[in-house]
């Protein structure tokens, strides 16, 4: 059975660099045999604001929570807005508080690959750091490689969504591989312990 890698990333702008970066990293996991689901900008923009005092959930909210619940790994991409995570991405992450009572709480035991796109290196670095802090707080394992892409430096993607920057494409492929490799190893470790 193939592993499920869930991608969360995008903006309200169709074809945003953060959405395309997450798609590129997910494609690398697919090439190595993973199944993927991507929650992009349009989907994320339609989610209601997370309100912990309101337990009712829309079908879209339930779909996101259930996908992350079933995920063997995640790839999260955010634009760097004013040095931090976009509200769209943070709202989706906040919704995952619904996983607090699960046997596998939040991101527990899962690798989380992180991608940041911004029009400048400062926002890239601060946003990546913020995302790593969030993943740690949610008991996830940020991958060793976090990808930051400066959209002011070069054209990152072609009109068809193909990554135009070779170095960026290589980094996104490596990120996807790290997430999937961790999922494979983590799944094998409990089986080895049970067999011992």
Residue ranges of each PLM-predicted region?
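Mobile beta-alpha loop/short-helix "lid" or hinge segments that flank ligand
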Residues: 37-49, 105-106, 139-159
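Short, glycine-/small-residue-rich phosphate/pyrophosphate-handling segment
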Residues: 108-150, 167
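N-terminal beta1-alpha1-beta2 submodule of the flavodoxin-like/Rossmannoid cofactor-binding fold
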Residues: 1-102, 162-196
């Amino acid at each position: 059975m193939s592993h499920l890698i869930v991608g969360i990333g995008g903006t309200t702008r169709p074809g945003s660099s953060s959405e395309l970066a997450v798609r590129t990293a997910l494609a690398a996991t697919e090439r190595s045999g993973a199944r993927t689901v991507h929650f992009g900008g349009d989907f994320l923009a339609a989610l209601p604001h997370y309100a912990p005092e309101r337990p009712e959930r829309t079908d879209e909210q339930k779909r996101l929570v259930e996908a992350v619940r079933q995920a063997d790994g995640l790839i999260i991409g955010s634009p760097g807005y004013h040095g931090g995570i976009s509200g769209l991405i943070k709202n989706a992450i906040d919704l995952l508080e619904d996983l607090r009572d699960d046997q596998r709480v939040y991101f527990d035991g899962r690798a989380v690959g992180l991608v940041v796109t911004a029009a400048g290196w400062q926002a890239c670095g601060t946003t990546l750091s913020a995302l790593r802090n969030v993943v740690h707080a949610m008991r996830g394992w940020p991958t060793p490689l976090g990808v930051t892409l400066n959209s002011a430096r070069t054209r990152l993607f072609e009109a068809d969504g193909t990554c135009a920057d070779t170095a960026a494409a290589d980094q996104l492929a490596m990120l996807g591989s790290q997430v999937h490799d961790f999922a494979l190893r983590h799944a094998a470790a409990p089986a080895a312990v049970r067999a011992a």
